[in-house]
Amino acid sequence: MGDRHTIQQNLNGLLSKLNDPDPDMRYMSLNDLYGILSNPCSSYLAHDQASATRLAEGLLKALDDQHGDVQNQALKCLGPLVARLPLEGLRTLLERLSNLTTSQTIDTSVPNTALRVIVTALPRPQPNQAPSPDANMAYSAVSEVLIPRLIGPGPHKRRGSVTKGMLEKDPAKGFSSDAIDVLIQVASCFGALLQESELTALEKAVMSIIDNDTAGTVVTKRALAAISALVVYFSDEQFGILVSELVERFNSPQLSTVHRRHLIAAVGCLARTVPAKFGPHLSTLAPFIFSAVGEDNLEVSHVLHYLCTSASNVYSSRNKPKIYHQYRQLPKEKLITGM
């Protein structure tokens, strides 16, 4: 109890110094706070909701500091803090940070970065092992709070709602590549626990970005990376549905040149990331890629390479699908060498 009492006194003192007008003092206080949170003696905070809440409030305030060094040190403290937070405290922190990502008055890259730090620091499922109770608890908070905020309210809930999904287009700022990076981190850390409905909803939110001709190059590339992170956890049935949706998009009479380029890039991501899942769908998607050959588009050449690499990996030399042999017969100046 003596150690706990001393630590609590130190924490209270450090939290009060976060209001000091001297940024150096605020930085040093956060540095000391990081040391305490990293010490096993502070593990009692997991059972002290009031103290954990005060710490979270102090760090949230420090994230809005005008000095970058102070902000960065506050971000550093979030990692060890989430290991000490009770479930309700974790939910509250995720909710607060998620709401800040759609603010019109602050630099929203900071709360997005904070969310990535938290997701990375949470206990996660390990390969070939049953998820631990801590990993299940962490996933429940991510599932209940963060994923709905990424996606936004469904159509039946949107009427009268002022809450915008983090992945939705902001009228003033456009799409957020930072929010996409949060999704990628969620998929990387908790993909094995994501429900099919969550995977589908996240995929649809990302595809709405890929479908948008006004999405910039950086945002589109991050959206493609997000699709790659998600499809690893798709069932064969889910993957088949995604392929069918891509075919519908390719066949749309309103398909623009930019949109088709984005879709071709998405096909390349699928072929590169999950070649075994992609193999059975080669003959379905290949014609859309071949139709773009000769348009002086390097992306098409890359995608053809991935398609045929997938064919080479999935099929035996005698049973390679028609696309593989079509690829080999195309003029070399249209292609990437190495096949």
From Swiss-Prot:
Alphabetized UniProt keyword annotations: Nucleus, Repeat, Ubl conjugation pathway
Note: In E.nidulans, CAND1 is separated into 2 distinct proteins: candA-N and candA-C (AC Q5BAH2), corresponding to the N- and C-termini respectively of the protein in other species.
PANTHER family from the UniProt entry: TIP120
Coiled-coil segments on the chain, per record: none
Gene giving rise to this polypeptide: candA-N
InterPro entries: ARM-like, ARM-type_fold, CAND1/CAND2
GO biological process: SCF complex assembly; sexual sporulation resulting in formation of a cellular spore; sporocarp development involved in sexual reproduction
Subcellular location per the Swiss-Prot or TrEMBL entry: Nucleus
Listed name of the protein: Cullin-associated NEDD8-dissociated protein 1, N-terminal part
Quaternary structure, from the entry: Interacts with candA-C. Interacts with unneddylated cullins culA and culD; interaction occurs only when complexed with candA-C.
HEAT repeat copies, ranges: 5-42, 50-87
Major subcellular location class: nucleus
Disulfide pairings: none
